[in-house]
């Protein structure tokens, strides 16, 4: 695990994300958790803080229900675009689920990276579960690698989909094996159909497809290796102090550990701090429940930086509110006088 900041006064890990800002070697940062816990707000806020201490930062949403555009009140798409008001912070929204359709569209039209492989691509997509996500994710990584961003932050899909990319090298290996099997099985028949340029009459080319798959596999294997390097990659878990969210967080941390991916920070959102003597029974009851789960989080993850974020009265949208929220990720929130 990466070295986290220690508070020497009480020998507790500092309750901030300052350790991530201080670790200059980090290239990939993933922000994930259960749906509705504030992942996007947290990833946007972390990106804002990182932009202050990095040459260039890219924020990527891989959640099909994209929220970056809403968070910054600015439309983003598949191409990286500078966020208004920043000179070194860009964002893009991609959908790792379904871009195989686009790839197949290019194949049928005879253009793009899949030119001349339409029917074969479709057969392959149906033959191997997950190949569409694997190939589209690999294409995204190729694009990101060609750009010169110092740090890349992923605002991920809800838990369950978040770690699929870890299986992609295996999926692509299966794809290559399938293509190889097709080549062996139908080789003699294909030889009789091949034209002078080594292509089928309809323009499909088996060798071309294998080369492209191999190229994607190499790209994703290289990045996958970087993901397992604690000097280059870390995962920030986001949760709220409730049973299901805590359960999902524990499951995710266990899974990250099994894939050797570093994680040492947890952001706990939506904390209530009712004033002493408050006559709001619901507030007090909820705070009591939150306190119980917060104590469990601190006990379970005593080697983590646990960041406690308050429930705010206003929605965190727009540059100014995100900047204000982001300050609390690096300066511990202090409840108003009289808060519990």
Curated annotation (Swiss-Prot):
One of its GO terms (cellular component) is GET complex. The active site is at residue 63. Homodimer. ATP binds at residues 34-41, 242, 269. This is ATPase get3. Transmembrane segments: none annotated. Zn(2+) binds at residues 280, 283. GO terms for biological process: cellular response to oxidative stress; pheromone-dependent signal transduction involved in conjugation with cellular fusion; post-translational protein targeting to endoplasmic reticulum membrane; response to heat; response to metal ion; retrograde vesicle-mediated transport, Golgi to endoplasmic reticulum; tail-anchored membrane protein insertion into ER membrane. Its EC number is 3.6.-.-. ATPase required for the post-translational delivery of tail-anchored (TA) proteins to the endoplasmic reticulum. Recognizes and selectively binds the transmembrane domain of TA proteins in the cytosol. This complex then targets to the endoplasmic reticulum by membrane-bound receptors, where the tail-anchored protein is released for insertion. This process is regulated by ATP binding and hydrolysis. ATP binding drives the homodimer towards the closed dimer state, facilitating recognition of newly synthesized TA membrane proteins. ATP hydrolysis is required for insertion. It is found in: Cytoplasm; Endoplasmic reticulum. The gene is get3. One of its GO terms (molecular function) is ATP hydrolysis activity. The lineage of its organism: Eukaryota, Fungi, Dikarya, Ascomycota, Pezizomycotina. The keyword ATP-binding applies. Belongs to the arsA ATPase family. Keywords: ATP-binding, Cytoplasm, Endoplasmic reticulum, Hydrolase, Metal-binding, Nucleotide-binding, Transport, Zinc.
């Amino acid at each position: 695990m990466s070295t986290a900041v220690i508070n020497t006064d009480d020998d507790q890990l500092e309750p901030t994300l300052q350790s991530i800002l201080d670790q200059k070697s980090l290239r990939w940062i993933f922000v994930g958790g259960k749906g509705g816990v504030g992942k996007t707000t947290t990833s946007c806020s972390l990106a804002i803080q990182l932009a202050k201490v990095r040459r260039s930062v890219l924020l990527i949403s891989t959640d099909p229900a994209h929220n970056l555009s809403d968070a910054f009140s600015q439309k983003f798409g598949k191409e990286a675009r500078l966020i208004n008001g920043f000179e070194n912070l860009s964002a893009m929204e991609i959908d790792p689920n379904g871009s195989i359709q686009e790839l197949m569209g290019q194949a049928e039209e005879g253009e793009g990276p899949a030119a001349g492989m339409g029917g074969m691509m479709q057969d392959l997509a149906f033959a191997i579960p997950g190949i569409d996500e694997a190939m589209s994710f690999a294409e995204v990584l190729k694009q990101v690698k060609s750009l010169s961003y110092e740090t890349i932050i992923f605002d991920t899909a809800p838990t369950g989909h978040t770690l699929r990319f870890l299986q992609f090298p295996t999926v692509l290996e299966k794809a290559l094996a399938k293509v190889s099997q097709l080549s062996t099985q139908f080789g003699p028949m294909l030889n009789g159909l091949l034209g002078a340029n080594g292509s089928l009459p309809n323009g499909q080319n088996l060798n071309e497809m294998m080369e492209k798959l191999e190229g994607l596999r190499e790209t994703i294997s290289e990045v996958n290796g970087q993901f397992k390097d604690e000097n280059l990659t870390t995962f920030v878990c986001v949760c709220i102090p409730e049973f299901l969210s805590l359960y999902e967080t524990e499951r995710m941390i266990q899974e990250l550990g099994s894939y050797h991916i570093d994680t040492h920070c947890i952001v706990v959102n939506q904390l209530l701090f009712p004033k002493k003597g408050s006559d709001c029974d619901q507030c007090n009851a909820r705070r009591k429940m939150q306190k119980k789960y917060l104590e469990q989080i601190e006990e379970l993850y005593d080697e983590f930086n646990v960041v406690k974020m308050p429930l705010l009265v206003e929605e965190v949208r727009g540059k100014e509110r995100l900047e204000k929220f982001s300050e609390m990720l690096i300066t511990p929130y202090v409840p108003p006088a009289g808060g519990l």
